[in-house]
Amino acid sequence: MKNLLSMEALTVHEIEHLLEQAAQFKRGKKATFNEQTFAVNMFFEPSTRTHTSFEVAEKKLGVEVVSFDAASSSMTKGETLYDTLLTMQAVGVNVAVIRHSEENYYAGLEKLDIAIVNGGDGCGEHPSQSLLDLFTIKEQFGTFQGLKVAIAGDIRHSRVANSNMKVLKRLGAELFFSGPREWFDESYLAYGTYLSVDEIVEKVDVLMLLRVQHERHSGTDEFTKESYHEKFGLTENRAKQLKEDAIIMHPSPVNRDVEIADSLVESEKSRIVTQMTNGVFIRMAILEAILKEQEMRAKLCTY
């Protein structure tokens, strides 16, 4: 695997391999790269979980993390992302994890030798989040085949939803959507069925809630926090309708008492904190796959 840019670029076999490697890391597997392996985390949008867990993953693998601050870089002088990455490549950085506000920012960057991991591109995709979600689901159920999974909330503006709806259908899950119709595109019906939140809670195995992404909305919000929670959120009463073995997920950050009642965030059915923990292990697996391929290519070039 040279880069990780989208879930669609991964085969089912590659996905299964990454999930298995993440499971091995969680069980205590060790993998250390030499001290001349470098990573840079380039985040042009705010991030807590993705940024932190990638850095922890890098350090657990023995990878040196190169500091980068967009606000103090030459990009403020007009340097392009391509030329910035060309610089990173020239000084010996092996892999760049990039979070960017523009969808498909990575177009044209694939020809560089430095590996690129998409840490989220606008409303486009978030492949490492999708993989950690898959890892969390597989840990719980052991399979995706036949699982009923609901994606509920601000779907149109969610890169997580874009990644997950495509891959979950490919892996054999049955998908449902819920949330405001204003934030739902009819094209999503190619992947699943739209139902009200009251209809989905009693039938799904996995309820995947999405944050209301105020920063990507134009104009005045159509819902107050209270009205959104009442109409579309997972209230305490709705949670009582969930199946006994159903789980609750959320990519975070969570708007408590908006998408989900505050009391449910750390409840028995919630896997929200587990997702954060699993993020380190899946990102270790991603980095290991990329860096091992780089090592193999380097060895071939010496013959």
Curated annotation (Swiss-Prot):
Catalyzed chemical reaction(s): carbamoyl phosphate + L-aspartate = N-carbamoyl-L-aspartate + phosphate + H(+)
PANTHER family the UniProt entry points to: ASPARTATE CARBAMOYLTRANSFERASE, ORNITHINE CARBAMOYLTRANSFERASE, MITOCHONDRIAL
Protein name: Aspartate carbamoyltransferase catalytic subunit
PROSITE patterns: CARBAMOYLTRANSFERASE (PS00097)
GO terms for biological process, alphabetical: 'de novo' pyrimidine nucleobase biosynthetic process; 'de novo' UMP biosynthetic process; amino acid metabolic process
Subunit structure: Heterododecamer (2C3:3R2) of six catalytic PyrB chains organized as two trimers (C3), and six regulatory PyrI chains organized as three dimers (R2).
InterPro entries assigned to the protein according to its UniProt record, in alphabetical order: Asp/Orn_carbamoyltranf_P-bd (IPR006132), Asp/Orn_carbamoylTrfase (IPR006130), Asp/Orn_carbamoylTrfase_sf (IPR036901), Asp_carbamoyltransf (IPR002082), Asp_carbamoyltransf_Asp/Orn-bd (IPR006131)
Pathway(s) annotated for this protein in UniProt: Pyrimidine metabolism; UMP biosynthesis via de novo pathway; (S)-dihydroorotate from bicarbonate: step 2/3
Chain positions recorded as L-aspartate binding sites: 77, 159, 211
Keywords tagged on the record: Pyrimidine biosynthesis, Transferase
MF term (GO), any: amino acid binding
Family the entry assigns: Belongs to the aspartate/ornithine carbamoyltransferase superfamily. ATCase family.
Chain sites annotated for binding carbamoyl phosphate: 49-50, 99, 126, 129, 252-253
Function: Catalyzes the condensation of carbamoyl phosphate and aspartate to form carbamoyl aspartate and inorganic phosphate, the committed step in the de novo pyrimidine nucleotide biosynthesis pathway.
Assigned EC number: 2.1.3.2
SUPFAM superfamilies: Aspartate/ornithine carbamoyltransferase
Listed GO CC annotations: cytosol
